[in-house]
From Swiss-Prot:
Subunit structure and binding partners: Monomer.
Reactions catalysed, as given in the entry: Endohydrolysis of (1->4)-alpha-D-glucosidic linkages in polysaccharides containing three or more (1->4)-alpha-linked D-glucose units
Name of this protein: Alpha-amylase
Gene Ontology biological process terms, A to Z: carbohydrate metabolic process
Length: 760
């Protein structure tokens, strides 16, 4: 809540009952997004580990459940964090969009309100967000409580624990916004909490820790400027207070929380350097300058950061206050994208994308947050963490280049098409745009050249998750023993350019039985040969290239062709795999014949340990109609996570995805076929009880052991125990444990044995 919104907000309440771091700058091979609005794209992306290195989506007035539903798309769009609207109680259950301000007049300091959802809804959101590596930042209102239509009077709906008069300042409402004491000790249209009071601080600590314990990983403090400090302009003053030291210092998990405050800059009494000692701050002066620059078409004032340290601020084009008070509503979608491209490609700051509301409170807002240009900029920001910036204007100040270190650049052009010719530190090469505009730029001898289209956003950098894939083409992405694989190599950008001969140096399973094979020239620095996969291969075929003197070994990574599985997927099942290969370090083939099977292309989107190291792998359609892809399960994995995309649509198992345990050796529990609701599977057990038991009982259920059942297993000749079960409708997760005749249990050290079940 800002000063500039205060007077208008007060009238509404009565009516309703009331920095540029100079630096210059590996050429990458970007894949252009095809969809204008994306759910996921067919590229590898990985979110930053820390909130401070990523971008934040302000899911303004979205309900907790609507945010949870969109988490897969939010992660795919490159957002590391989601800011939720205030979670505290409200004095009315209205969900009318014009009553958005209700959330900024809290009746308590506890989680749950009629507009966004309950405590359990919030906790469930946080739990699911963790699976995607997404931080949940809560907008909290700690400066004041709800009024009854009269600014100084507490609303009747306010919780009884906040009706004690000693919890409030009684100094009236602020009229002199240039007086620091008035700004912090008087009201801003609502009853002003006595934040020097230990009782008020204790309540704040309890509430904020409730949020943290439920899974919140950060906070935005609304109206932080109106809560005094004991530094700067407040030091040794009668109104000085220790709210921030005591409250922030008492938070659980405090070292891992991302905290920022609304401290609107006025250049006089904002005392902003004091707040920077405790938290990050909104770059309010910069967002005004940026918005003005975008509206005028002269980007000169889009430079700088409004006098703030970019490493201590959250920057944006518009906030909810500015939108709701008509300061930014006139921005077009194109202007919003252009402003976002500048704000989010800057160094140091955490950019906040405000999602404009389109319906009642609780509804999801408009779709611009997942526009292909917005997503391209998000990914650029994530890839540029730690890189300095070099800003310059072009095209009569209608275009800006934000170059980040030596890794990449974003160009925002609000003017007509122009020919670019400017110094750069990017490496020589051709750079395709990651955004929606179809064009490319060339870097040669320290200069970037090309045509920049009118009203365009160009994003150039290297984000290829498989370095070297631009110069190697395989006839088979995975192969079985005895298969022939044709390898085509483009030496045009390598040390082997213009070589008179090129040999394929290849072997298997770490270059065992390595040998060289002469390749055939196709002209234009392209070479080709065909090999037959040996029967001795257990993991993969390895190869690199040489002319006898120079080498191309993919910067030490070499190239690999994984060994495909001999497993035959079961007809009629949407997902299948050989669960005996769920071993860290093994190749693992996933077969897919689900909702996207008739698409022209399907990619496997996968990660490990809760979606770490996410990447996409193109699948190949086999003669049985299944799409298949083979991955090497990382040695560090405990779980494998996956879903499927055709580049514009997703099959994520009705928002449940697929999650499988991985093992360090032969899995103790195997299933075949892969579990699917309403279908039969065979369960094989070879765990700690298997060898000595005279009988084994399978105890199983779905979705957290709902309606558990017991079934006797039958011992097989190979020592494993077998039971066949039919999964019920709605089953998306099969849960299992085992016990022997004496009642001894094997429940996987209280974790049970769990397999995702296809349920769509």
């Amino acid at each position: 809540m800002s000063k500039r919104s205060k007077l208008l907000k007060r009238r509404m309440l009565s009516l309703s009952v009331i920095c540029v771091l100079i630096g210059y700058g590996p050429v990458f091979n970007p894949v252009r997004s095809q969809a204008k609005v994306m759910t996921y794209s067919s590229e590898n992306r990985e979110l930053p580990e820390n909130t401070k290195d990523g971008v934040m989506l302000h899911a303004f007035d979205w309900s907790f459940n609507n945010i949870k539903k969109e988490l897969p798309s939010i992660a795919a769009a490159g957002y590391k964090a989601v800011q939720v609207s205030p979670v505290q109680g409200t004095k009315s259950n209205s969900t009318n969009s014009s009553d958005w301000w209700l959330l900024y007049q809290p009746t308590n300091q506890a989680i749950g309100n009629a507009q966004l959802g309950s405590y359990d809804d919030f906790k469930s959101l946080c739990s699911e967000a963790k699976n995607y590596g997404i931080s949940i930042v809560v907008d909290v209102v700690m400066n004041h409580m709800a009024n009854n239509g009269n600014d100084d009077e507490v609303a009747s709906e306010v919780d009884p624990s906040f009706k004690d008069p000693s919890l409030y300042h009684h100094n009236g409402q602020c009229t002199d916004w240039n007086n620091r004491q008035d700004v912090t000790q008087e009201g801003i249209g609502m009853p002003d909490l006595n934040t020097q009071s230990s009782a008020v601080q204790s309540k704040a600590i309890t509430f904020l820790n409730q949020c943290v314990d439920a899974g919140a990983t950060g906070f935005r403090f609304d109206a932080a400027k109106h809560i005094e400090t004991d530094l700067g302009l407040d030091a040794n003053k009668s109104w000085s207070g220790n709210y921030w030291e005591n409250v922030l210092g008492s938070l659980h998990n405090k070292s891992n929380l991302y905290i920022y405050g609304e401290v609107l800059q006025d250049g006089k009494v904002d005392n902003i350097s004091a707040y920077e000692s405790f938290m990050n701050v909104e770059a309010s002066a910069y967002d005004g300058s940026l918005r003005g620059a975008i509206k005028s078409g002269d980007l000169t004032n889009a430079q700088g950061m409004g006098g703030l340290d970019s490493n201590k601020c959250v920057d944006m084009l518009e906030t909810h206050d500015e939108y709701e008070h008509n300061e930014s509503k006139d921005l077009t979608d194109w202007q919003r994208k252009a402003g976002w491209a500048i704000a989010a490609s800057r160094a140091g700051s955490v950019p906040l994308f405000f999602d404009r509301p389109t319906g009642n409170i609780g509804s999801e807002g408009d779709a611009l947050w997942k526009d292909s240009d917005v997503v391209a900029v998000n990914e650029f920001h994530n890839a540029m963490a730690g890189q300095n910036e070099y800003l310059r204007l072009q095209n009569n100040n209608k275009a800006m280049i934000i170059e980040r270190g030596s890794k990449g650049a974003v160009i925002v052009n609000e003017g007509d098409s122009f020919n670019l010719n400017t110094p750069t530190n990017l490496e020589d090469g051709n750079y395709d745009n990651h955004g929606s505009a179809t064009d490319s730029l060339t870097v040669s001898q320290g200069r970037m050249t090309g045509t920049v289209p009118a009203n365009s956003i160009i994003v150039i950098y290297n984000k290829n998750s498989n370095p070297g894939s631009d110069r190697v083409t395989l006839s088979e992405q995975a192969a079985k023993a005895g298969d022939s694989v044709t390898i085509t190599y483009d030496a045009g950008t390598t040390a082997l350019k213009d070589a008179s001969n090129v040999n394929l140096y290849w072997g298997y399973d770490g270059f065992s039985a390595a040998t060289s094979k002469a390749m055939t020239s196709l002209g234009d620095n392209k070479w080709q040969t065909t090999i037959t996969v040996p029967k001795e291969v257990t993991k993969n075929v390895n190869f690199s290239f040489t002319d006898g003197t120079s080498w191309d070994n993919n910067n030490g990574a070499n190239w690999n062709i994984p060994l495909a599985s001999n497993y035959l997927p079961h007809a009629g099942y949407k997902v299948d795999y050989d669960s005996s290969n769920l071993v860290s370090g093994n190749n693992f083939t996933i077969y897919y014949n689900g909702n996207l099977a008739n698409s022209s292309n399907v990619s496997l989107h996968w990660g490990v340990n809760g979606w770490s190291n996410m990447q996409n792998l193109a699948m190949v359609k086999d003669s049985n109609g299944f799409w298949e892809a083979t991955i090497a399960i990382p040695a560090s994995s405990n779980t494998l996570n996956f879903c499927f995309t055709n580049g514009s649509s997703w099959d994520n198992n009705n928002n449940n995805n697929w999650t499988l345990n991985t093992w360090s050796s032969v899995p103790k529990v195997q299933v075949t076929p892969a579990p699917e609701a309403c279908k039969q599977i065979s369960v094989y057990y070879n765990g700690s009880l298997a060898s000595s038991a005279s009988n084994i009982t399978l105890h199983w259920g779905c979705n957290g052991f709902t309606s558990p059942q017991d079934i006797n297993m039958v011992k097989q000749a190979d020592g494993r125990w077998l039971a066949n079960i039919t999964l019920p409708s709605g089953c998306y997760n099969v849960n299992m444990a085992f016990k022997d005749q004496s009642g001894t249990w094997d429940n996987n050290n209280s974790n049970n044995y769990n397999f995702s079940s296809t349920n769509n």
